[in-house]
Structure formats: structure tokens, C-alpha cells
């Protein structure tokens, strides 16, 4: 059970709600504090105070006055008009993450929503009523308006939603779950949709996936390192400590420990001076990726516990601000995209080295009868194609901005785009690593098997499901098998 209180949500909690379907709850104290703020806000509105998005129009329509008896209708119209997303529906796990982040942001108490709204979101998550949210439509300021509006639309019993994984009209989904359509109160529509929870929810899942990617990349690199006869001299502690970036030192020490007991490395240490960069600089490159992952997680730890609505209410005054601007998240998503793209680049270069007999000293394309057999010639092409795709996707979305709302919103973050394309990069890098697992294990068939105990664990785990290559067969199926093993964390479990 994940407790929502508006201040202590962790990235791993978001993952637990989204992927592992952990239930959520809100304490009575949190609900009481939220409701008190809501009641205080209503008193302010009833006094005639002008508040953006409550008794005014939105965006460039901010100078249009809304009568008191139209304020509820305004919120409903906002949800309907802003539900303008297009494209395929986002996977339910990402929508669950988005809802968890938005729920926590609203629970902070600055958005002046009622406890009823929070309870509705809790019940939808716990009863598996997940709004159908199109992927595209957010520019990342003023918040993730379009996709979050689709969540509000489903809450009202309009649009589409998934119930227990099946797509249907949201009214039917709510009914099957034993819920009634939600009636938005003053400010609740704008509070729900005006925030960074779309990009933050997606990035929360992405950064957890990035941890797994790095762990797998370390393990797949062990196979290539030993197959190529690498020397561990570059991982000497004082060398790593002479440039003490946290990630570099940590990765270098782990890699050296994993190689302990290898006869292959022991021989290489006695005769080789240094290796090519893709072997020698694993701590520097992988360590930098680890540092980026930590940076992104730190950004998210702040963002998912922040009030990103506009305007905000502290119990006494309402102030319009800019916390909805997704720049911190947008930059973090782009940074992670660049880091993972370069991780894939290094892995692909080792793959290329494995199949090149002039560089590896191994049989051409890792087949015992090359010529008649092409062996693993083409998987390197696949890795190269995926790297090329990632290099296109790695262009920073945050480098662009397109003014919206008649230039009232004249600078935007494009953080949603950055988070979405990061998902494709992650998928591509997983496949690149799967190819290194496949080819690295095959390359070890041509050594004396004097690998370290740690490397042997990975090698044997692969051989449980993928046979060595004696003659040509389609590599695609083996790549997919290894990819599924990665998804199940089998290699991480085999070598903690």
C-alpha cells in the first residue's frame, strides 16, 4: 500500500503503483487538511475575489469574467475543450503513473481541491479504472493540459477508459467498478489538468527502466570483455580514484570485482598494455550514465512532491505563478535520452568488434564455418540501425518552443515529447544489449572458458534458453528470447 500525502512520494512508489499495481491510500489527516483549504478557498471566491481559472477564462481569455453560477460549468467545459489529444492510447501503466503523481501533487494542498476529488482518483486506481489517454497533445506548459484533460473526461463519465484492461465507454467502466461520474467543483478542472504529471509520470517509469538497462549493460559487457581478452588494469582503484566521479568509481569497482577469478583477464593483465576504448572506458561511460540516472531521479523526487498547478492557494491568498512549466523535467528527460543513446553506442561498438575477426581474433561473424554460414553478421546491422534511430530521437525536445494560446503562453518546455521519445530509446537500447548478450555468449564458445565465476553465471543463464550457434539460424528469435529474459530481470537475479 502506497500512502499519498503530497510530500513523500518516491519514484519507486510511482513504479509500484503503475507497474506492480500496488494500492494507494490517503490518510484522514491529509484529507482533512485538503478539505480545510478547499473550504477556505470557497469563502474567498464567495467574497468576490477574482481568481484566474475560477471566475475568469483561460489562457488569453483571462480577462473574460465568469459569473458565480457558471463556475462549475466552466470547469466541465475546460475538461471537454482541452481533451484534444491524438494518437494511440498510452499504455495503462504510464497512465497509472501519471494519476499517482497528479494525485500526490493535489494532496499537497495548494490547489484548493476537495477531498472528494482525491478520493475519486484513489478509487479509480484501486479499482483499475484507467482513463484512455492519447499520447500526443502536450507542449509541457501550461502543464500537460491535453492528456490530463482526458483523465478528467473519464472521471466525468465521458470519453473512453479501461476497466480491468478492457477498453470501453468511461461511463460503463465507472459503473462496472461501482463508481459514479465525478462532478468537478470550483477550480478542480484546472487544478487537475494544469501540471507536469504527464511528463513526470512517464519519466518516473523511464528512470526505473534506465536502472535496469544499466545493470544489464554491465552484465552483457562482461561477456564481450572476456571474449575479447580485455585487461583489467584500467580498473585499478587508484586510477578510478584519480578522477572520483561517483558513477565512474562505483562502476569500475563493480566491474573489477565481477572479473575476479578470470584466467582470461589474468593472462591479459600480464601481456597487454591497454584495450580499445569500448573496453577500457566502461567505468567512465557507464559511470556517467549512472550519474545522469541519479540526477534525473533527484529532479523527479522534487517534481512529484510539488504543487504544479496555477494559480496556487496557501490558505490565505491566491497567486498566479509558473510552477506548471515543465522545464526541469524536460531537461532531465533529454539528458537521460542522450545518456542512454550513448550507452547504446558503446554497446554497438563492442558488438562490431566481436564480429570483426581482424579486431577480435575470433572466427568471422562468430560462426565455426564462415562463408557457408554468415553467422552473426546481421545482428550488428540491427544494432547499428537501432543506434541510428536513437541518435535521431536524442535531439533535445527542450531545445524547441512554440508559442501557444495567442502568445500568452509564449515559451513552453516540450517535456512531454521528451518523455515520450525516451520510451522508444529505452526499448531500442534494450534490444542492443540483448544482441550483445547473444553475441558475447557465442564469442565465449571460442575461448578456453576460463572466464570469471560472475561472467560464467551470465553465460550459463543465456545457455538455459539459447543454444550456441553451430550453423545458421534466424537470430531474431534468440534476440527476442533474451529480451524477454531481460524484462523478467533474469540476468540481474543471476548476478546480484
Swiss-Prot record:
Cellular-component GO terms for this entry: cytoplasm
Gene: hutH
Species: Thermoplasma acidophilum (strain ATCC 25905 / DSM 1728 / JCM 9062 / NBRC 15155 / AMRC-C165)
SUPFAM superfamilies linked: L-aspartase-like
5-imidazolinone (Ala-Gly) cross-link site: 141-143
Name of the protein this chain belongs to: Probable histidine ammonia-lyase
This enzyme's EC code(s): 4.3.1.3
Pathway(s) served: Amino-acid degradation; L-histidine degradation into L-glutamate; N-formimidoyl-L-glutamate from L-histidine: step 1/3
Keyword Cytoplasm on entry: yes
Family: Belongs to the PAL/histidase family.
Domain of life: Archaea
Catalysis: reaction(s): L-histidine = trans-urocanate + NH4(+)
GO molecular function annotations of the record: histidine ammonia-lyase activity
Subcellular location: Cytoplasm
Modification type 2,3-didehydroalanine (Ser): residues: 142
GO biological process: L-histidine catabolic process to glutamate and formamide; L-histidine catabolic process to glutamate and formate
Modifications made to the protein after synthesis: Contains an active site 4-methylidene-imidazol-5-one (MIO), which is formed autocatalytically by cyclization and dehydration of residues Ala-Ser-Gly.
Annotated InterPro entries: Aromatic_Lyase, Fumarase/histidase_N, HutH, L-Aspartase-like, Phe/His_NH3-lyase_AS
Swiss-Prot/TrEMBL keywords: Cytoplasm, Histidine metabolism, Lyase
Main location: cytoplasm
